[in-house]
Amino acid sequence: MEWGSESAAVRRHRVGVERREGAAAAPPPEREARAQEPLVDGCSGGGRTRKRSPGGSGGASRGAGTGLSEVRAALGLALYLIALRTLVQLSLQQLVLRGAAGHRGEFDALQARDYLEHITSIGPRTTGSPENEILTVHYLLEQIKLIEVQSNSLHKISVDVQRPTGSFSIDFLGGFTSYYDNITNVVVKLEPRDGAQHAVLANCHFDSVANSPGASDDAVSCSVMLEVLRVLSTSSEALHHAVIFLFNGAEENVLQASHGFITQHPWASLIRAFINLEAAGVGGKELVFQTGPENPWLVQAYVSAAKHPFASVVAQEVFQSGIIPSDTDFRIYRDFGNIPGIDLAFIENGYIYHTKYDTADRILTDSIQRAGDNILAVLKHLATSDMLAAASKYRHGNMVFFDVLGLFVIAYPSRIGSIINYMVVMGVVLYLGKKFLQPKHKTGNYKKDFLCGLGITLISWFTSLVTVLIIAVFISLIGQSLSWYNHFYVSVCLYGTATVAKIILIHTLAKRFYYMNASAQYLGEVFFDISLFVHCCFLVTLTYQGLCSAFISAVWVAFPLLTKLCVHKDFKQHGAQGKFIAFYLLGMFIPYLYALYLIWAVFEMFTPILGRSGSEIPPDVVLASILAGCTMILSSYFINFIYLAKSTKKTMLTLTLVCAITFLLVCSGTFFPYSSNPANPKPKRVFLQHMTRTFHDLEGNAVKRDSGIWINGFDYTGISHITPHIPEINDSIRAHCEENAPLCGFPWYLPVHFLIRKNWYLPAPEVSPRNPPHFRLISKEQTPWDSIKLTFEATGPSHMSFYVRAHKGSTLSQWSLGNGTPVTSKGGDYFVFYSHGLQASAWQFWIEVQVSEEHPEGMVTVAIAAHYLSGEDKRSPQLDALKEKFPDWTFPSAWVCTYDLFVF
């Protein structure tokens, strides 16, 4: 395969090869004439020539000597990528027409919005609060009753309010154990009048985190489910199976309510599949980011039924890798119910997720309509499917699935995907193998140039990554992290341009000093082959690892290879002219369009997460790495243009100038990370806990007592931006770890201590909640197997955390929590998350300690923290006064808590 007709320079090189092999010293005229005939070996004969002209075109004749215009090539590629990005953006803004209001069988987004506004008007709905347990539950039951009155006689509606108590351990945030008591689930079963033996579950949660109205997480999902219930119940089409709607009231308590339902409710045994509605952002499209496990028929159901699909197996594999610090009820149904399902979530605008800005007015009616159309169609499909009743028969196998710009979904079994992938690999092997196996007198130095070019490509990527990481580390060290958080284009201008400039520099140096005697067209072909080979290696690796995401590499190998096979004749005759470039870019349309589509999703999800990922992970290093990787992928099939172009000086100068100016502006603090813009806020998250701590010794005496406001910034910048506004919050009040206390002696709400190691402690008066916690040892006894059993009782607010640290020579062997086996958190301590609904009894539990030797300092240290997340007890005058001082670009989430430590 050739990139162009044989140039005079190439002919001279071929003559030189023949001369070295004993040919005549000068080619006769007839040999020169024969040289005009096209080669059939698929190679330009090695491409080596005499010294290149200063222009760097790599040849003397037309086609080889006429290089691409640098300005035209650079602008053309830039406009090409911008056009593709515009198409991606347009696909994300597809408008959905609302069904006629009140028309039976149509989802009405305005009715769902009415539900949403009523739920969010109640305010924050933490588990155990009257807002969650009484007001929201009452509203849901009221609306369900109205729906039941309007329902078609073909259907039967049953309603149950469940208040489960239970415990489980979960491998999340380093691992911990959860205990819940008397929390609330509202369960509705819609079934045929004669009943049903099988059911599909739809799940949402109506509780919210503290200090947030929780419109997207997850009131909008519950509103969608209410409207879907209304539409299905009024339908004149009979269902084959039941649809169970679970409105759970304790998801934000780390998935407690779903565990209570699936392990204790009598209807749980009917469920064969589920759909979980969640949020990681506010509005936009709802992404299918988890399916299964296995059960490919569920993906097929979504593909067949969803009207506005948005799904990706890539998102599934990224989420299940644990990179994203989040989890959903999907895990509970999968692990404790052994039920397959589909997990959907809104992912756009995660900047205001779990903040006071998560309000109903920020969720577009279009988003509600899209979600409602999809959920209604998929539930109806499952409720009338024969596969639901025999789900076990269709259990085995995974699916490769992805949507195409939201228009439709492509899905096929992963085993078929593996076959397709290896067929693509074989195509590359045949293509490259033909070149590698040809005699040297035909291929010249192709093998050597290919291997050297591969090394140059890898060096260019490595040095580019090192360059952007050096920039990112420097920016982090000078305190200018997250400069791109409110201005994403800053990251592109800083890290993206640096990556491209370094790649171009390395290849330009190679072109000038190593490949100085090779034709441009020959080098263009070599580096196209190198890019093809690299993507083929990715394809083999991902397929061998069993990752369904390998389909992306297959696309990035198959389409470029087909493009090369289609355009080589035109290029051979006319060189790198406009027609060739147009066909080349057209052939790259699908891989580049889909890559940009995925890259948008990656940054839409990960950029906001980096603003709440803790104080230990440098966000600039993470973002720079991701951006550099994406840039390397996008530039891979354009590297050959560096060798086809006459020069790269202007491009490198422009990129370097943009990078340098952006770097200076970032270092000077021009780009402030946060925003209080009412239309698009991007706040800094800060947790304020006004607490009183009491430490007791082995005899029960209080040996230490203090009080203050414990401050945690949830991003890498800590309090550096806050100190100028609130001078008393500075590094002189940095909190210090209590080495002998579990989790450093602080009242962690969740075990995220390993993510947030920098915190501050501002002295303040003691707190005195009206409902103070009580903790006592009920009994201490020795078991027949020589362990010590300690039984405790605790009472307090709806949320408490219990911590245990075993002393040297002691181990926790059993306890009455979870499955009976104690689970450690990161750092070796034990963490128990406790919550209750209304009117819960005292919490009694026991632990068993195995002691190998007597210790005068006791066996274990335990501590209990009480968190007041609702009502008057959550506030204090000092806390309110401090909150008022915070600038409007922050979101300070504040509550009162106590911490009591004991030694036994």
From Swiss-Prot:
Keywords, comma-separated and alphabetical: Acetylation, Disulfide bond, Endoplasmic reticulum, Glycoprotein, Hydrolase, Membrane, Metal-binding, Metalloprotease, Protease, Transmembrane, Transmembrane helix, Zinc
Species for this entry: Homo sapiens
Binding positions for Zn(2+) 1 per the UniProt entry: 205, 217, 278
CC cofactor note: Binds 2 Zn(2+) ions per subunit.
Positions marked as site (Transition state stabilizer): 353
Location of N-acetylmethionine modifications: 1
Protein name: Endoplasmic reticulum metallopeptidase 1
Record topology, Lumenal segments: 85-399, 479-489, 541, 601-621, 673-904
Cofactor requirement: Zn(2+)
